[in-house]
């Protein structure tokens, strides 16, 4: 492990020199690529430096315990020894986690599909709450968020299903833990007796696929057009700008109606289809390796109830790791950082256990 860490640090220093080279700076593609690699290594190098300092401090305090005759100095050395005896193993564990192989899709952009489940109008409203939550989370992360498809409910302002595209740094790696069934417990606006109702919405997070990831044959596609119910200026309900594409071999159907032209909607729909097919391919690879299937957090099993939002008690519970917070309003306002970090740490710990077990 330590040979690997030293190699990483050497590479980090090498990139640091290259990034100040005028020849590299003038080549924007190379500069961007090196800068991304540099950023990816910085956390490991920082943790490794901290580990080495702690290890040196532990050794020095140990030597002082044996050589120091002054009682006061010896007491200080003992305190340092006790502190670093705990700190060094913790930092070593952190390094092991940081050295875990990165998942192939983690650095990619993502599509998020939200569907209202059981609960009628209340489920549709909750689905809209989740959409707003993810939109605000995207804003907090500096990600770009675009609505690809939106199927309104006929009730109180919620929706049956919606699809958004998120673009930015490490989007899929951050959002993948949101896949699954989200349950809400609250008193609906239409409830006159004050009774708490339970509703649900499902979330699917898909990594965005590149053109070279998936080969799609034209003869496998069936494309239909229809009049859009979304934005589109004067074209709305007059021109068939909305597009629905069916991938015949898999039975997957995607639709897009948010753009102003049929061509734009077709391009967006193809992007959605490619991501869905890539997600299937990725899941098959993960199943073969049995890496992510070993951990319920990582699989994002869309049939599993993962989280409950209890409005009367302002409580959110993630059932996969037993995480509970009473900051429900903040969470719905896009402050998902604490809960996602807890899920990420749990996932890393489980992967490390699996690696050691193997």
From Swiss-Prot:
GO terms for molecular function: translation release factor activity, codon specific. This is Peptide chain release factor 1. SMART domains: PCRF. It is found in: Cytoplasm. InterPro entries: PCRF (IPR005139), Pep_chain_release_fac_I (IPR000352), Pep_chain_release_fac_I_sf (IPR045853), Prokaryotic/Mito_RF (IPR050057), RF-1 (IPR004373). Methylated by PrmC. Methylation increases the termination efficiency of RF1. One of its GO terms (cellular component) is cytoplasm. Its main location: cytoplasm. It holds the Pfam family PCRF. The modification N5-methylglutamine is found at residue 234. The gene is prfA. Keywords: Cytoplasm, Methylation, Protein biosynthesis. Peptide chain release factor 1 directs the termination of translation in response to the peptide chain termination codons UAG and UAA. Belongs to the prokaryotic/mitochondrial release factor family. It comes from the Bacteria.
